């Protein structure tokens, strides 16, 4: 039955999304838990993640001692400009952010629409890494930014990234700090704020939307693009000659990808 096939497909997509998102901590437990040393947010066209994080930090500034906004200009930066243009609030700064590195777009959003207290008033130190052009460089250059700021003893570090790339990004950060003695390495935890769920509706895949998180279908990927991202990501994670692991390009450590 075609409907059964779509229903099976939705289960497969959700399984894959859950694996790639690799959520180890969610925003609610982050809000309630002890402050962490560092939160890294990698810019993504899913702006809802930044919105929810900035809102949480506005209501509880000591959430993290350091906040790093991450992302230069890469192959999908234009999608972030498009997402800003479509956004009901942020669209007012579209002209100003067009052409900026991704991390600077996040900084504009943070400064214009949210108010965090300064470090002296208990707020986080905000750093910007705006030179990287891919996931591996995000990690290496973020470490440089932290080192230059004198932030070298990080115990707990939350990584917020596009849910389709969350597992790989965490692996990239672990790789970037692997030269440190085991006890001095940060403990990285993946915290994708938005993890899409799909279901079958009239023979089509559609997103299950979370009204509490203020998430709209247009905030997410077109479904075909979403599928392509998921499949491409699995290829990168596999530790073989085509992947990004030790047996391939060596950008990340070994990741077990279930068959």
Go through each PLM region and give its residues:
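A structural signal for short, hydrophobic/glycine-enriched beta-strand patches
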Residues: 1-211
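A conserved mid-domain beta-alpha-beta active-site/ligand-binding segment of alpha/beta enzyme cores
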Residues: 197-259
């Amino acid at each position: 039955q075609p409907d059964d096939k779509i229903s099976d497909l939705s289960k497969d997509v959700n399984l894959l999304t859950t694996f790639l998102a690799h959520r180890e901590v969610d925003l609610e437990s982050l809000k309630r838990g002890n402050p962490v040393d560092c939160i890294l947010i990698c810019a993504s066209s899913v702006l809802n993640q930044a919105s929810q994080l900035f809102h949480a930090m506005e209501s509880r500034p000591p959430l993290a001692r350091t906040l790093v906004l991450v992302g230069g200009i890469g192959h999908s930066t234009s999608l972030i400009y498009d997402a800003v243009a479509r956004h009901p609030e942020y669209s007012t700064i579209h002209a100003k952010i067009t052409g900026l590195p991704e991390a600077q777009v996040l900084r504009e959003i943070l400064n214009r629409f949210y108010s965090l207290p300064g470090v002296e008033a208990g707020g986080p130190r905000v750093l910007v890494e705006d030179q990287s052009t891919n996931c591996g460089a995000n990690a290496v250059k973020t470490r440089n930014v932290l080192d230059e700021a004198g932030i070298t003893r990080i115990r707990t570090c939350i990584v917020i990234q596009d849910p389709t790339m969350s597992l790989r990004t965490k692996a990239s950060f672990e790789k970037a700090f692997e030269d440190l003695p085991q006890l001095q390495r940060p403990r990285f935890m993946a915290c994708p704020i938005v993890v899409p769920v799909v279901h079958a509706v009239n023979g089509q895949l559609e997103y299950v939307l979370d009204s509490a998180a203020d998430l709209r279908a247009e905030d997410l990927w077109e479904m075909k693009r979403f599928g392509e991202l998921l499949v491409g990501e699995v290829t990168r994670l596999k530790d073989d000659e085509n992947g990004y692991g030790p047996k391939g390009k060596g950008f990340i450590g070994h990741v077990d990808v279930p068959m």
